[in-house]
């Protein structure tokens, strides 16, 4: 499976990144500031994220802009395949998924899943599901989610034959603390991100590119409010 091969490659790369600290006139904090300052000047980005845990393999393909974006997620959970899509338009999240995604992955009840799989559901800010669903589906949210925290260190690896100096720190998501490395492109924008949690066996890798392409996303017609879905 292609995404498994990608994860293996990224594991090797992230191990190298974690192992090699480099000397530089720029401090880790200054490099982090420069990377995210460059990214915040842009209007949109495309990224592909591969993740793996003990019983889960997943791929997220996303196109995100300042106030809108779309994220398509495919996954295999304990050998079963699922998929769902999240759209964010003007701070409203819209979700559509198959039965496995709604019930086993996202925690909807069996009755809710039976009624609403394959249909768009709208989730406003303030709803308990909003934060997790809307995470990384706009450009500001994505940059927030890949921002490495202290302690910081400079790291070096080779991508496509080119040596790249990045910054390594920590990222806390869903109660799990990852060792996170962010590598910049030639314009100092994020190019690749790796997250590893050896304690729980979580691995995550993101390839970033195609900056400033149009993100044409509209709110789905006839979406069912989440309050209606959960009222039954």
Identify the residue ranges that each predicted region occupies.
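N-terminal leader/targeting segments and the immediate start of mature chains
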Residues: 4-68, 150-158, 213-232
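Short, solvent-exposed coil/turn segments at beta-strand boundaries
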Residues: 39-44, 60-72, 87-93, 160-164, ...
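Beta-turn initiation residues at beta-strand->coil junctions
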Residues: 49-53, 73-78, 97-99, 171, ...
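Short, solvent-exposed loop/hinge segments that bridge or flank secondary-structure elements
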Residues: 53-61, 127, 131, 175-176, ...
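An acidic-aromatic
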Residues: 65-134, 203-205
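Transition segment at domain starts
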Residues: 132-144, 152-154
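Gly/Pro-enriched, hydrophobic low-complexity segments
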Residues: 155-224
